[in-house]
Amino acid sequence: SDGRDAAANDKATDLIALTARRDPCCSNPVCTVHNPQICG
């Protein structure tokens, strides 16, 4: 990813943290690995 994506991800971190436990991605190990910012 580039710097612009990182900045956007930083701004979204709080919202992601609130929704992570309900995100269906987080019950999929492959998705979790590719989206650590969502599922941590």
From Swiss-Prot:
Residue positions where Cysteine amide is found in the record: 39
Cellular component, GO annotation: extracellular region; host cell postsynaptic membrane
Disulphide bonds in the chain: 25-31, 26-39
UniProt note on tissues of expression: Expressed by the venom duct.
Molecular-function annotations in GO: acetylcholine receptor inhibitor activity; ion channel regulator activity; toxin activity
GO biological process, one term: negative regulation of signaling receptor activity
Entries under Pfam families matching the protein: Toxin_8 (PF07365)
UniProt KW keywords: Acetylcholine receptor inhibiting toxin, Amidation, Disulfide bond, Ion channel impairing toxin, Neurotoxin, Postsynaptic neurotoxin, Secreted, Signal, Toxin
Entry's localization field: Secreted
Principal subcellular localization: secreted
Superkingdom of the organism of origin: Eukaryota
Region (Ser-Xaa-Pro motif, crucial for potent interaction with nAChR) residue spans: 27-29
Comment text on domains: The cysteine framework is I (CC-C-C). Alpha4/7 pattern.
Sequence similarity: Belongs to the conotoxin A superfamily.
Role: Alpha-conotoxins bind to the nicotinic acetylcholine receptors (nAChR) and inhibit them. This toxin blocks mammalian nAChRs (alpha-6 or -3/beta-2 or -3 > alpha-3/beta-2 > alpha-3/beta-4) when heterologously expressed in Xenopus oocytes. Does not block the muscle nor the major neuronal nAChR alpha-4/beta-2. Discriminates between nAChRs containing alpha-6 and alpha-3 subunits, being selective for alpha-6.
Listed name of the protein: Alpha-conotoxin PIA
Species the sequence originates in: Conus purpurascens
